[in-house]
Amino acid sequence: PKYSDAENAITSNSNFFVPQGESFTVEPVSFLISNEGVLVSMRQAEFRTFREAEKRLQMNYRSYSTGYHILISLLEVRIDYDADLVEMVGKQVAAVSKEISSGSKIDKEVLYKINALQENTMLLRENIFDRQRVLSSILRSERFPNDIYPRLQLMLKDVNSLISHADFSFQRLDYIQDAALGLINIEQNEIV
C-alpha cells in the first residue's frame, strides 16, 4: 500500500522520478515512522530531495523536532521538484509544438517525440497523484502533530495544481499529435 497507519508504525511508499536525458527513471522510496517519531527511509539511490531537506534541517533544526516534521519537509521538497519536472515537460511540449508549427517536414521522429512526451507526462501525473494519495492519508491521520496540518493542506493544493498542469500538457500533446497526423495526411495527399 502507498500508506499504512499501523499500531506500531506509519509506512509510506512513493516513487521518485529522476530525469534521464529525455525520459525518467522511477525509483521507489519507503518511509517508516515509529511511534516514537523516528523516521527511517529506505531507498536504492541518492536523491536531490534528501540533500535539499537536509539543508533545510541544518538551517532550522528546531522546526524538525520529529520524524513527522522531517517527512513533511521531504514531501514539500519533493513537490517542489515535481513542479520543476512538470515545468520541464511543459517546455518540451512547447518545443515540439513549435517544431510542428514551423512548417518543416514532419517525420516519424516528431511522432516518436510526441509519444515519448505523452508517456512521460502520464507517468509524471500518476506519480504526482500517488503523492496526493499519501498527503490525503496523512491529513486523515490523527498521529501527526497538529502544527503539520496547515502545511499539508497547502501541499495538497500545490499537488492538485500540478495534476492540472500535467493534464493540460497531456491534452496539448493530444492536440499536437492530431495536428501532426493531419499535416502528414495532407503531405501524403499532395504526393498522390
Label each region the model flagged:
Residues P1-R62, E87, Q92, D130, ...:
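Helix-boundary and N-terminal cytosolic regulatory elements
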Residues E36, S102-V192:
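Membrane-associated alpha-helical segments
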Residues F50, G67-Y68, D107, Q132:
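Alpha-helix initiation and N-capping motif
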Residues Q58-H69, S97-S104:
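Short, charge-rich amphipathic alpha-helices with coiled-coil/heptad character
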Residues S65-V93:
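Well-ordered alpha/beta subsegment
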Residues E76-I79, A94, K98-K108:
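Extended, Lys/Glu-rich alpha-helical coiled-coil stalks
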Residues A83, V89-G90, A94-V96, K108-Q118:
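Loop-centered beta-sheet repeat module
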